[in-house]
């Protein structure tokens, strides 16, 4: 048995992820520690994915993640099958961030360690001047299967349109 708790799934996002092309994520192959997870079979699943520049960073830890934790049950009421948090960190950092925030089964934490998915979507920025390297921009998206229904991209240094409350307001 893996030392990872089943409630805390971390995953690698391999180089096989190509891009969002015509509003659909193509070849989104996730290798995870738990093969039975819904993201392994996303067809017909409603997924809310939000991306943060980094685990344990100020805005991500104080505002972005807590909003999705607070409204997790409201997302489930809106028939969202999975809430996913993506960050350019390694899976061990993502697990520690999940544990530190007592996220349990509410949010799936995915590590985009080499920024493969973020780069493929064209949603990265260079944080080298802050000793962060390449990071994902702050954004959120609503997906049905792998089709992107809505995409909310933040301007640099801003936290607004990708908040849990704003995303929740776009779900019918």
Regions found by a protein language model. Give the residues of each.
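Chalcogenol-based redox active-site neighborhoods
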Residues: 1-172
